[in-house]
């Protein structure tokens, strides 16, 4: 009877039409939501959700409600001043993964934002795109228009790039290609205005071992050595977040409501049509409902979008039946295909460290205070760098990573491996089929010299992070209860495909080669971790099981945009198979991980999603 009442209420709203909401600021209370009507409900106010909501509400007659599980930040220094960076206050609490079988059953916290603006509030601000091959790989999975040529206009539309000064560009060997950068979009980005002096030696070392400069890592190829652009507003030298770029400018629109600190429990359906959502306070409380006359757009993130779908009856049949959830659409791919980028740490001491460096910043309060004075005067300052990062990065192709090592056969061994051996034994045949196709695409990508599979980042003193950005392993995220406030079951299944260990071994040796180059060797580095005793593959893998990090906070791909017969969940228009009026518009819709940090690509994909939605409703010219 309760469900019937909900549907009858929704139908009565449809008869009245989706009226424009009352004229007040976007941030609203639950009571105000109950007295309003909406065309669209966006589940999640992260980068994707805010981008799409902003673009839809540019049309005055289109009303949108965004429901975000977290708060709106208060403009704290630890968010907006890069040198004060602290992510923990806005991280989802208690979100841990299952014991990782290949990592000695270690348990890790999953880093997920719970705040308006999502990852753009808590990440390290790196603003790199995926490569042309990354997106062409998406398109080859049946997603027409999602290749590089289809995405590049949306990168340009989303961005507002500020060029560095000639002096900074010369000092930091910063180069770029203006023709592929956007200059009129909402998302401001540039380069921090301070260069640690030791980074010049890293640049020389990279050149010495054959890593070439990259003119522009955002131009479709991202291998080489380069300075990373950051999501920083060069007018204020503060973090450029989705909250500031896509929320603040729209805050006074009467057709845009934002409900914070509120969790969506499930999508409401009339048959197979999504008509609204149930929601409750994130701290706990009673269930309320809101209705969408046109569509529900899910953007809850790669770990929570599958949870929302599964709680709503969209997901693997066996899972839903076990929890007595009525099945709306049997989609085995919901929650499968989870991916993230792994990190292996190096630790060094130095006989002659180049200073000032990151340790100077962290430990010398006098110097740090002097630098803060410069920052507050908008002068060059270390405070424009996301603490404790340095902007120089070396990204390696598969060929670069394995050159001059005994590991050139890694890819051949991977191709000989049965894809089923890398997935759970009970995996659905369609998901297995999709994974097998993804592997073939990845094998082709890895042969290209312009696509990065891994890289190194040095903080200018003790710490180096070595990344595998294109893992073969696939994990999952599933619910095990119907409480919408309970965390889902998460397992990255790191190194379930041993190719990922082998690639990390090759990258480890490449890192050692880099620091043995004359410009860095002259400083007298001593490798503490892994340490000189760790040499054999067996020793390296043993250590990786102890210290490898399975998540870089770049979770993706858990509701993939692929054909249904390949375990896909979404059409190329991001529509959920077996339903109407329901789309997934966040990073969950990616079929496979990109070769770099995701933020810039999330903005661009959000712009594309907004245009797809506008086009289908006849609003594209608005």
UniProtKB/Swiss-Prot annotation:
Keywords: FAD, Flavoprotein, Glycoprotein, Oxidoreductase, Signal. Residues 1-18 form the signal peptide. GO terms for molecular function: flavin adenine dinucleotide binding; oxidoreductase activity; oxidoreductase activity, acting on CH-OH group of donors. Belongs to the GMC oxidoreductase family. Pathway: Secondary metabolite biosynthesis. The keyword tRNA-binding does not apply. Gene3D superfamilies: FAD/NAD(P)-binding domain, Glucose Oxidase, domain 3. Its cofactor is FAD. Dehydrogenase involved in the conversion of monodictyphenone to the prenyl xanthones such as emericellin, shamixanthone and epishamixanthone. Monodictyphenone is first converted to variecoxanthone A via a paeciloxanthone intermediate by the consecutive actions of the FAD-dependent monooxygenase mdpD and the xanthone prenyltransferase xptB. Variecoxanthone A is further prenylated to emericellin by xptA before being reduced to shamixanthone and epishamixanthone by the dehydrogenase xptC. One of its GO terms (biological process) is shamixanthone biosynthetic process. Pfam families: GMC_oxred_C (PF05199), GMC_oxred_N (PF00732). The keyword Nucleotide-binding does not apply. Disruption phenotype: Impairs the production of the xanthones shamixanthone and epishamixanthone; and accumulates variecoxanthone A and emericellin. It is an enzyme of class 1 (oxidoreductase). InterPro entries: FAD/NAD-bd_sf (IPR036188), GMC_OxRdtase (IPR012132), GMC_OxRdtase_N (IPR000172), GMC_OxRtase_C (IPR007867). The gene is xptC. It comes from the Eukaryota. This is Dehydrogenase xptC. FAD binds at residues 47-48, 68-69, 123-126, 598-599. Coiled coil: none annotated. Its EC number is 1.1.-.-.
């Amino acid at each position: 009877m309760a469900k019937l009442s909900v549907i009858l209420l929704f139908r009565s709203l449809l008869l009245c039409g989706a009226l424009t909401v009352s004229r007040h600021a976007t941030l609203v209370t639950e009571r105000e939501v109950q007295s309003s009507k909406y065309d669209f409900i966006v589940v999640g106010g992260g980068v994707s959700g805010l981008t799409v909501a902003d673009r839809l509400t540019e049309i005055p007659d289109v009303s949108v409600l965004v429901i975000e599980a977290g708060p709106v930040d208060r403009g704290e220094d630890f968010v907006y001043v890069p040198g004060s960076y602290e992510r923990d206050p806005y991280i989802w609490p208690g979100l841990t993964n299952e014991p990782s079988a290949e990592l000695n059953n270690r348990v890790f916290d999953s880093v997920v934002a719970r705040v308006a603006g999502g990852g753009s509030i808590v990440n390290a601000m790196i603003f790199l795109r995926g490569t042309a091959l990354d997106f062409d790989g998406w398109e080859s999975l049946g997603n027409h228009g999602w290749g590089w040529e289809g995405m590049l206009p949306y990168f340009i539309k989303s961005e507002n790039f500020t060029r560095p000064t000639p002096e900074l560009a010369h000092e930091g060997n910063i180069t770029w290609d203006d023709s592929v950068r956007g200059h009129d979009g909402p998302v401001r980005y540039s380069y921090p205005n301070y260069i640690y002096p030791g980074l010049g030696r890293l640049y020389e070392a990279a050149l010495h071992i054959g890593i070439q400069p990259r003119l522009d890592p955002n131009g479709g190829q991202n291998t080489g050595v380069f300075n990373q652009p950051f999501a920083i507003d060069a007018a204020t030298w503060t973090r450029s977040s989705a909250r500031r770029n896509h929320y603040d400018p729209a805050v006074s629109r009467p057709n845009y409501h934002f409900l914070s600190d509120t969790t969506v429990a499930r999508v409401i359906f009339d048959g197979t049509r999504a008509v609204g959502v149930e929601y409750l306070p994130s701290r706990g409380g009673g269930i309320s409902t809101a209705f969408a006359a046109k569509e529900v757009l899910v953007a809850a993130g790669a770990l929570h979008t599958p949870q929302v779908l599964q709680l709503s009856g969209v997901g693997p049949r066996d899972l839903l039946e076990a929890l007595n959830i009525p099945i709306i659409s049997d989609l085995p791919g919901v929650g499968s295909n989870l991916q993230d980028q792994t990190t292996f740490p190096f630790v060094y001491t130095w006989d002659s460290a180049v200073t000032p460096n990151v340790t100077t910043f962290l430990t010398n309060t006098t110097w740090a205070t002097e630098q803060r004075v410069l920052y507050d005067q908008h002068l060059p300052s270390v405070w424009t760098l996301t603490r404790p990062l340095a902007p120089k990065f070396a990204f390696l192709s598969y060929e670069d990573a394995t050159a001059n090592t005994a590991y050139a056969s890694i890819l051949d061994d991977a191709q000989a491996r049965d894809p089923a051996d890398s997935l759970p034994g009970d995996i659905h045949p369609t998901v297995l089929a999709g994974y097998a196709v993804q592997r073939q695409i990845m094998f082709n990508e890895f042969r290209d010299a312009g696509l990065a599979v891994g890289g190194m980042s040095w903080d200018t003193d003790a710490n180096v992070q070595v990344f595998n950005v294109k893992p073969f392993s696939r994990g999952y995220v599933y619910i095990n209860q119907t409480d919408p406030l309970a965390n889902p079951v998460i397992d990255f299944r790191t190194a379930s495909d041993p190719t990922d260990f082998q690639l990390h071994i090759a990258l480890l040796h490449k890192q050692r080669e880099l620091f043995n180059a004359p410009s860095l060797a002259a400083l007298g580095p001593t490798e503490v971790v892994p340490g000189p005793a760790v040499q054999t593959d067996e020793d390296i893998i043993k250590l990786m099981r102890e210290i490898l990090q399975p998540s870089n906070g770049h979770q993706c791909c858990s509701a993939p945009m692929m054909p249904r017969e390949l375990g896909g969940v979404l059409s190329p228009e991001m529509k959920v198979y077996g339903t109407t009026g329901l789309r997934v518009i966040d990073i969950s819709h990616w079929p496979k991980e990109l070769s770099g940090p995701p933020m810039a690509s999330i903005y661009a994909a959000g712009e594309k999603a907004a245009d797809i939605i506008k086009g289908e409703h006849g609003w594209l010219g608005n």
